[in-house]
């Protein structure tokens, strides 16, 4: 698992590759 970018809400974080899912609702 990779860390997500700073400021990315945990629910928006794709934990396996550390990508912030910015297109997800509420992100």
UniProtKB/Swiss-Prot annotation:
GO MF, one example: toxin activity
Disulfide cysteine pairs (residue numbers): 4-13, 8-20, 12-27
Isomerase keyword on record: no
Entry annotated with the keyword Disulfide bond: yes
Location(s), subcellular: Secreted
Tissue: Expressed by the venom duct.
Gene Ontology CC annotations of this record: extracellular region
Top-level taxon in the UniProt lineage: Eukaryota
Alphabetic keyword roster: Disulfide bond, Knottin, Secreted, Toxin
Domain comment as written in the entry: The presence of a 'disulfide through disulfide knot' structurally defines this protein as a knottin. The cysteine framework is VI/VII (C-C-CC-C-C).
Protein name as it appears in the record: Augerpeptide hhe6.2
Species of provenance: Hastula hectica
Lineage: Eukaryota, Metazoa, Spiralia, Lophotrochozoa, Mollusca
């Amino acid at each position: 698992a990779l860390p997500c970018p700073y400021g990315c809400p945990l629910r928006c974080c794709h934990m396996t590759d550390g990508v912030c899912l910015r297109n997800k609702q509420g992100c």
